């Protein structure tokens, strides 16, 4: 995490990853009433530029947007962040800082991408995000990244 924490924000308010593709960015922009599509931000891993936010954040704007658009929100935190501040997010590599089984499967399904296996994940990924309903600590988990959860649990129980 040292490299992540040392990453400069520049003029960004946040550092985060996106888990959507261009088509969904356009659909989300239309749904949220945005002038331009911005990467749809996954808030599972989110770093805040506190000095910039303390200086610039307009909570009335956030509240007004939430009141106006509440009926179209799917994931309210992500919808608000994307719509109001999507242009002020420093995007991080999801394969490194917010890897989920879905992102791994989508990456490996694209022919132009070099396949990524668990050895690659072990060597390069910093944060695994068990997002959605399926969790490795619950029955019926589907995916391959549960191996890291189980290894951690074994280590803790020693």
Per-range role (PLM):
Residues 1-24, 45-48, 55, 81:
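GT-A fold catalytic core of metal-dependent nucleotide-sugar glycosyltransferases
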Residues 1-4, 25-30, 56-61, 140:
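A short secondary-structure junction signal
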Residues 10-34, 139-145:
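A short, conserved beta-to-alpha structural element at the edge of catalytic cores
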Residues 38, 42-158:
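A glycosyltransferase accessory/donor-loop signature
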């Amino acid at each position: 995490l040292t490299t992540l924490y040392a990453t400069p924000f520049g003029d960004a308010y946040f550092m985060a990853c996106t888990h959507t593709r261009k088509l969904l960015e356009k659909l989300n922009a239309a749904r949220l009433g945005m002038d331009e599509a911005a990467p749809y931000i996954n808030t599972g891993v989110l770093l805040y530029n506190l000095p910039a936010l303390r200086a610039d954040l307009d909570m009335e704007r956030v509240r007004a947007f939430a009141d106006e658009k509440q009926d179209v929100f799917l994931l309210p935190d992500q919808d608000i962040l994307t719509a109001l501040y999507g242009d002020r997010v420093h995007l991080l590599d999801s394969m490194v800082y917010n890897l989920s089984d879905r992102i791994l499967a989508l990456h490996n399904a694209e022919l132009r991408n070099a396949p990524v296996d668990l050895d690659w994940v072990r060597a390069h990924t910093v944060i695994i995000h068990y997002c959605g309903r399926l969790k490795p600590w619950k029955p019926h988990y589907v995916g391959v990244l549960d191996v890291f959860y189980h290894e951690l649990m074994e280590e803790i129980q020693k």
